[in-house]
C-alpha cells in the first residue's frame, strides 16, 4: 500500500483568550466588555510581548515529527491554502527562538520569581491550557508545556471529552465556545476554495459570548476595527488580485497580533494499492476525483 497526504485548509492552532476567564467574575467571565479589551482584559495575555514570546518558544517541527509525520507540516498562518492566499510574511515561526522570547519578557517587566515563574505587578504567567481528549493532542500539550517552561511560564494541562468540548451545550462551562481557560487548542478549516466567510470569523461581531449564547466564531474575543474594515472591503471586492491582497492582510493582522498561534498544517491522508498509478490526492474534492486517470501497473 502507498500513503499520500493532501493539504487543504486544516490548521491545528492555539486560541488566545483576550478576555479574563477568572471564575470569580461570575457572569462576566471571559466576556468582552467594551473597547478593545480594555475593561475585561486578560491579566497577561493582553500583553503583546507575552503572546509573541509564547509563539517564539514553540518548536513546531518537534510537534510535527512527534504527532503527525507526513500528515502534518509547520504552519505560520491560519490560512495556509489555497496557495494563492498563503502569506510568507510570518515564516519566522518555523524557527523557535527561546532567547528572544526570554528577552521580550525581561524587557516587558515579567521577572522570574523564586519558583522560576514570571510575574509582574503580582500577576503570574500561569496558563490553563485545554483541548479535547486525543493522544496526539495530549502529546502536543506536554511538549508545549516543557517549551514554555524554558521561558518561565507555568502551564496546567486540561483535556475534555470531544463530545463535551465541541458539544455546544450552553449550560456547560467546558465548551470551546465559552473558552473559560487561557489557551485552547483545536483544528478548524473551511470547505471550498474561497476564504471570505472563514476570514470573517474574527470580526468583532463574531465574538462568542453570553449575549449570542456563545454562537459566534471569534473565540479569542479579539476585536480590531481595522480588521473589520478589511473584511467589509473584501465582501464588495470581486477582482481576484484585490481578494488575494485583502486575505493576506487579514491573515497577517491576526498572526502578527498573535490573536491565535498556528501550529500544524494538517493533511488529509489516504492509501491506495501499489498496483495503481495515476492516483493524485486533492484536498478540495473526493479521493476519486481523477479515477478516470487511474491505471493498473
Task: Identify the meaning behind each predicted range.
Residues 263:
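Active-site-proximal polar cores
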Amino acid at each position: 500500500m502507498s500513503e499520500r497526504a493532501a493539504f487543504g485548509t486544516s490548521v491545528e492552532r492555539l486560541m488566545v483568550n483576550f478576555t479574563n476567564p477568572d471564575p470569580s467574575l461570575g457572569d462576566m467571565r471571559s466576556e468582552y466588555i467594551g473597547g478593545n479589551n480594555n475593561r475585561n482584559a486578560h491579566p497577561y495575555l493582553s500583553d503583546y510581548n507575552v503572546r509573541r514570546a509564547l509563539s517564539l518558544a514553540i518548536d513546531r517541527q518537534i510537534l510535527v515529527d512527534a504527532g503527525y509525520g507526513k500528515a502534518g507540516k509547520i504552519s505560520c498562518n491560519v490560512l495556509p491554502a489555497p496557495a494563492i492566499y498563503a502569506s510568507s510574511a510570518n515564516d519566522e515561526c518555523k524557527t523557535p527562538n527561546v532567547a528572544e522570547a526570554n528577552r521580550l519578557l525581561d524587557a516587558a517587566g515579567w521577572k522570574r520569581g523564586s519558583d522560576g515563574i514570571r510575574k509582574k505587578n503580582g500577576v503570574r504567567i500561569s496558563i490553563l491550557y485545554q483541548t479535547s481528549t486525543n493522544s496526539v493532542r495530549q502529546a502536543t500539550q506536554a511538549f508545549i508545556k516543557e517549551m514554555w517552561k524554558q521561558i518561565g511560564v507555568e502551564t496546567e494541562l486540561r483535556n475534555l471529552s470531544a463530545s463535551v468540548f465541541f458539544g455546544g451545550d450552553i449550560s456547560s462551562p467546558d465548551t470551546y465556545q465559552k473558552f473559560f481557560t487561557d489557551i485552547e487548542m483545536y483544528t478548524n478549516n473551511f470547505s471550498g476554495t474561497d476564504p471570505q466567510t472563514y476570514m470573517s470569523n474574527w470580526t468583532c461581531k463574531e465574538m462568542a459570548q453570553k449575549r449570542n449564547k456563545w454562537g459566534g466564531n471569534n473565540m479569542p474575543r479579539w476585536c480590531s476595527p481595522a480588521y473589520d474594515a478589511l473584511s467589509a472591503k473584501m465582501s464588495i471586492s470581486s477582482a481576484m488580485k484585490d481578494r488575494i491582497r485583502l486575505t493576506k492582510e487579514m491573515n497577517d493582522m491576526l498572526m502578527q497580533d498573535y490573536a491565535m498561534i498556528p501550529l500544524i498544517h494538517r493533511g488529509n491522508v489516504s492509501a491506495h494499492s501499489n498496483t495503481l498509478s495515476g492516483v493524485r490526492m486533492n484536498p478540495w474534492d473526493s479521493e476519486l476525483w481523477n479515477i478516470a486517470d487511474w491505471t493498473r501497473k
